[in-house]
Amino acid sequence: MMTQPNLNIVPFVSVDHMMKLVLRVGVETFLKELAGYVEEDFRRWQNFDKTPRVASHSKEGVIELMPTSDGTLYGFKYVNGHPKNTRDGLQTVTAFGVLADVGSGYPMLLTEMTILTALRTAATSAVAAKHLAPKNARTMAIIGNGAQSEFQALAFKAILGVDKLRLYDLDPQATAKCIRNLQGAGFNIVACKSVEEAVEGADIITTVTADKANATILTDNMVGAGVHINAVGGDCSGKTELHGDILRRSDIFVEYPPQTRIEGEIQQLPEDYPVNELWEVITGRIAGRKDARQITLFDSVGFATEDFSALRYVRDKLKDTGLYEQLDLLADPDEPRDLYGMLLRHEKLLQSESTKPAA
């Protein structure tokens, strides 16, 4: 673990540091190891404070805070979702996060989480699919080839062995980008001209679109028996990707029902519609995939424990790397009750420095 020589100093992981860390570890290794942390925290689900994320909605998008604690550590993520940003040359999702010590309340880590969120989302999807997808699934359709598509592909390759991709996006340039970025990664890739073509022969269907709308990306006639659906695009009220008939045919698995009923595909269904919780599958309390013809649906919206897992993982991986800055973030007077005195002493220091003769 990193040492903090002064209590005012908090390790800060910039975007540059995060990219260097991911590349040093290796993207697929990073995803596999991160998935291990995610699964570990789902196994101790009962230890966590859980609440739906705190959201501020506007017609342009949403800004959210995602907090949780296991009683020893506290973590939160600030994240936005603004689908229109792509038209303005901006990311649809940006994020940063904090990990803190519950005992003192002092932050232990401040880090970028735009890249890290894409990695943790993909790792979580692959963890769910490990328990829900057909045995020996090798072919995945990805509907929506934007910023998260490559991460999803690489996570499913690293954790499930998926090596055949069928890609579709309304924007052919997005598909071309995805193919270009995954060259040499060990995939057999087919660019498709429609959703119907993309899902043909797929064991797993991933939907990861960005539009903030009740869209119907996938209709019931496109989904055959035995398929696992990884529905990633839903993350706020009023944003869906699947036709309701698909939900009624599927066994639905969610992260945290109170949040998913607001933001996920199941917002289309009655509030008491039965769903299964992913942590119960991972811990063996309930069965995941029961037979070869079962349609399983992971209604993923992202939950705070996954960000907590990602923050823990990054904290642990930073040891001896030097891939962080020492950020002077916290006021730490010698006498904890004398915060104003600290300000006065600094004023004197500035005055003495200003009267020093120039060298």
Swiss-Prot record:
Q: What EC number(s) are associated with this protein in UniProt?
A: 4.3.1.12
User: Which positions form S-S bridges?
Assistant: none
Q: Which UniProt keywords apply?
A: Arginine metabolism, Lyase, NAD
The biological pathway it contributes to is: Amino-acid biosynthesis; L-proline biosynthesis; L-proline from L-ornithine: step 1/1
Q: Tell me the cofactors it needs.
A: NAD(+)
Reaction(s) catalysed by this chain's protein: L-ornithine = L-proline + NH4(+)
Pfam families reported in the protein's UniProt record: OCD_Mu_crystall
Which SUPFAM superfamilies is this protein grouped with?
Answer: NAD(P)-binding Rossmann-fold domains
Entry annotation: catalytic residues: D235
UniProt record, GO biological process: arginine metabolic process; L-proline biosynthetic process
Annotated L-ornithine binding sites: R53, K77, R120, D235, V301
* First-tier enzyme category under EC: lyase
- Give GO MF terms, alphabetically: ornithine cyclodeaminase activity
Instruction: Please list the residues that bind NAD(+).
Output: T92, R120, A147, Q148, D169, T209, V232, G233, G234, D235, K239, S300
Biological role stated in the UniProt entry: Catalyzes the conversion of L-ornithine into L-proline with release of ammonia.
Report the family membership: Belongs to the ornithine cyclodeaminase/mu-crystallin family.
Q: What is this protein called?
A: Ornithine cyclodeaminase
Q: Which organism is this entry from?
A: Brucella abortus biovar 1 (strain 9-941)
